[in-house]
Regions:
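Short, structured coil segments at secondary-structure junctions
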Residues: 30-33, 127, 181
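Active-site/pore-lining binding-face segments in mid-to-C-terminal subdomains
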Residues: 153-213
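Alpha-helical, coiled-coil/dimerization segments enriched in small aliphatic residues
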Residues: 112-138
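Short, well-structured alpha-helical interface segments that form or flank functional binding sites
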Residues: 115, 141, 204
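Acidic/His-rich segments in extracytoplasmic proteins that coordinate ligands and/or metal ions
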Residues: 1-61, 134-176, 252-258
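Short, surface-exposed loop/turn motifs that are enriched in glycine and acidic residues
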Residues: 109-114, 135-136, 144, 195, ...
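Short, conserved, surface-exposed binding loops centered on an aromatic residue
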Residues: 89-94, 123, 144-148, 177
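Extracytoplasmic substrate-binding proteins
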Residues: 23-109, 187-258
Length: 259
């Protein structure tokens, strides 16, 4: 996370997308082109999902290949969301489960999360999941606040996810949470960024969580879907083993992202 002016100038960066408005303003004051694109929306994320892709279309849409990829991404996301939603809607007997999300993108412990109004909340709503993080006053809830709700499921994302997972099972009173006791703790894969962010793999986030939360209903071929995604958007070929390692929260060679 090197946001220094010197780094961007040295790399000859033409345009910077960044989620922090203060940093974007600072970069602009130093003559760099910086746009603030946030990963949440005050009025809810459902109508904001395509905002970033449409911004890219405005900037580079004169290139037919770019516009076609934007259409492809929007279609992939919509298809994934509708597929899981329609399947779950056909099963009214399914009970809503509560979920706590641990943001492992930075090394900030088990009490670092997302407050909702984000892609996470949009996806979990389609998955018939009660995303409890939107109840907290800050993105650093106490263990007592999480224990009070006692979530059925915990999902962990980010490059520190294995470190967080080990802490979760070995640290009291975190390991007394229902999700931990019943072994309903799921990882979120990381590609170029975490799948739970608005990114090329957003559709894969939907499929992977559906597989983990509802294994009796969904069995998407995540290895094939991941390979297809990387090939389609980046012309990058991933072996079966590399794709599986990525899905399991490791580097493609099977090593830990963070020791």
């Amino acid at each position: 996370y090197d946001n220094s002016v010197e780094t961007f100038i040295m790399r000859g960066v033409d345009l910077i997308f960044i989620p922090e408005p203060a940093t974007a303003q600072m970069l602009r004051e130093h003559g760099l082109n910086a746009l603030c694109v946030r990963q949440f929306a005050e009025d809810g994320y459902d109508d904001y999902v395509f905002y970033f892709s449409e911004m890219i279309r405005q900037i580079w849409g004169s290139d037919k290949a770019v516009s076609e990829k934007i259409d492809m991404w929007q279609s992939d996301f919509t298809t994934a969301l509708n597929t899981v939603k329609q399947t779950l809607d056909a099963h009214p007997e399914i009970q809503t489960q509560t979920l706590y999300y641990i943001n492992g993108e930075k090394d900030r412990g088990l009490g670092y999360t997302d407050l909702g109004k984000s892609l996470l909340e949009t996806v979990y709503k389609a998955l018939k999941i009660d995303f409890i993080c939107n109840r907290f006053e800050s993105n650093r809830p106490s263990v007592e606040a999480v224990l009070e709700i006692d979530p059925d499921i915990i999902s962990i994302g980010g490059i520190y996810q294995k470190k967080r997972l080990n802490e979760l099972y070995s640290t009291e009173p975190w390991n007394q949470i229902k999700a931990v006791r019943e072994n309903k703790v799921y990882n979120i894969p990381v590609g170029f960024v975490g799948f739970e962010q608005t990114c090329s793999a957003s559709a894969l986030f939907i499929y992977s969580q559906a597989n983990q939360i509802y294994p009796d209903l969904f069995d998407f071929d995540l290895v094939a879907l991941t390979q297809e995604c990387l090939q389609k958007y980046f012309d990058y070929t991933l072996t079966d083993n590399a794709a599986q390692n990525l899905l399991d929260g490791y580097f493609k060679d099977g090593s830990f992202m963070i020791e």
